[in-house]
From Swiss-Prot:
This is UDP-N-acetylmuramate--L-alanine ligase. It is an enzyme of class 6 (ligase). It comes from Staphylococcus aureus (strain MRSA252). Keywords: ATP-binding, Cell cycle, Cell division, Cell shape, Cell wall biogenesis/degradation, Cytoplasm, Ligase, Nucleotide-binding, Peptidoglycan synthesis. The gene is murC. Pathway: Cell wall biogenesis; peptidoglycan biosynthesis.
Amino acid sequence: MTHYHFVGIKGSGMSSLAQIMHDLGHEVQGSDIENYVFTEVALRNKGIKILPFDANNIKEDMVVIQGNAFASSHEEIVRAHQLKLDVVSYNDFLGQIIDQYTSVAVTGAHGKTSTTGLLSHVMNGDKKTSFLIGDGTGMGLPESDYFAFEACEYRRHFLSYKPDYAIMTNIDFDHPDYFKDINDVFDAFQEMAHNVKKGIIAWGDDEHLRKIEADVPIYYYGFKESDDIYAQNIQITDKGTAFDVYVDGEFYDHFLSPQYGDHTVLNALAVIAISYLEKLDVTNIKEALETFGGVKRRFNETTIANQVIVDDYAHHPREISATIETARKKYPHKEVVAVFQPHTFSRTQAFLNEFAESLSKADRVFLCEIFGSIRENTGALTIQDLIDKIEGASLINEDSINVLEQFDNAVILFMGAGDIQKLQNAYLDKLGMKNAF
């Protein structure tokens, strides 16, 4: 039995990958910071040991998986090289695993995690599917036919993968600390397209995805009859969103998603396209779609009296707009209150005006101090720069959290990729619901 040690095991992808290797029968442990991170819950539930960083964690006969946030100068990586152990980066190791399956990569600036979660759930309704989701969830099912996984474009990590299929949800400028501009992002996706072995499923309304060239067929999905697979007759019901699906202009079937918002229909179309191409049983696919419960930190709801408190990972202007749209469609008679924590100074600086525009779609806006990262913990701007651009916006922290109680009939959206859950939990504690998230 191989013994794997994950350096940075609480990272969302690393946590998922560690769980997969554990499920497949390997001995797994890892190390990370001692501060609480939500991904550790799933690790502890599976009995996977989490250690504080220490060179003495590294033993003979281990394979060491190196998280992308950690340099080769990290004490555990140094010790591994001293012991002449195999040290493999996260993305290279994942690239080796997927070659054993019919693999489906889900990539794009936005919607990766939600789509991967939906894909894994729906495909498991018909065929065994192992999966790696960017919310820290992973499962390795013995004798799986398929492997669904999230493929991140950051630092071109997804170029380590050669999947059978790729779902490309969109191309957008993000990660301004790495990508120079939208053309740089496009070039990365174009290179990724040449790694795909069977087919690409891409959103038809994305002007950049329409320019992608590949050595395999590209199937576009959307709401237009010119798309290869499209949805029509969309109806919002108390059970979710119902819609008809057409493939190559011919009626395919009627589907019901328990979610709300145009972006959730698009995610479903991408998943349905994969199931269609792989000739999965449509009855099983429909049933699985109707039972999808979502993924962690993507519009996760808690209802207290007339308030709906939502935990969401949205940290880019387009994601914020989509989250607000979902709230308005699902709760049309409630006020929408946005509580947002910007993630990284470089992203806040690059999208300052766009953040202001998207957040202004809420009825009220509260902002937290900017959350830094391992690579970047200071910047040339402050949260006041964003507050000044949004009418009626104000600063919020744990000491002033009680201001949210005044919104009696509202959806309270806690959004961000940092530690905004501390603020959520402070509010829930005040309301008498401890540790809901």
